[in-house]
């Protein structure tokens, strides 16, 4: 629908020729793009080679994506000179290229960064909540962090329900119907109750 928790919408895959039309939807769904294949190649090669890539491998993968949009090419010598970490840059590249495509959760779980990424408040754009004529927040249910960003869901430390338990949340529970079919299957740690 035409809803957004933040007020921002994703432009990816929208056909401008169909704007304002109630017909003409797409019959094809993008499941995987060549860009994702190149990113998978870069990450897998990096991991298999002991956290290293050659400039040739970066040119074959990351720089093909960057060349497509006339972006500055990734260069190992520059990364080193600027004190930048290759692993962080590869992950950032993936986060940007695949934004809005539904891969972020799986990436964070694979990288074991759940505590870092999911253990904090969800915030929106910096709106600097406007005060009404009486000097009060007209939206009392809306929390605002120290930067003026609207808080949609608070972390446990702030009294909300959001938290990430590393002993439990890296695995999903085994569904009860599957466990009933095979009582020897057991349950993943933390999901026993």
Give residue spans per PLM region:
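Acidic/polar-rich alpha-helix caps and helix-coil junctions
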Residues: 1-193
């Amino acid at each position: 629908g035409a809803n957004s928790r933040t007020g921002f919408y994703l432009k990816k895959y929208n056909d401008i020729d169909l704007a304002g039309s109630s017909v003409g939807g797409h019959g094809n769904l993008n499941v995987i793009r060549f860009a994702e294949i190149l990113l998978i190649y870069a990450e897998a090669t990096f991991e298999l080679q002991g956290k290293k890539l050659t400039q040739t491998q970066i040119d074959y993968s990351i720089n093909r994506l960057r060349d497509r949009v006339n972006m500055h090419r990734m260069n190992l010598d520059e990364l080193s000179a600027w004190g930048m970490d290759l692993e962080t840059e590869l992950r950032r590249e993936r986060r940007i290229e695949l934004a809005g495509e539904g891969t972020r959760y799986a990436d964070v779980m694979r990288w074991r960064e759940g505590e870092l990424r999911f253990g904090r408040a969800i915030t929106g754009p910096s709106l600097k909540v406007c005060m009404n004529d009486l000097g009060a927040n007209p939206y009392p249910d809306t929390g605002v962090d120290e930067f003026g960003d609207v808080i949609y869901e608070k972390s446990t430390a702030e009294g909300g329900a959001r938290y990430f338990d590393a002993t439990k949340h890296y695995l999903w529970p085994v569904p009860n119907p599957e466990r009933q079919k095979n009582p020897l299957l057991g349950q993943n740690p933390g999901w026993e109750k």
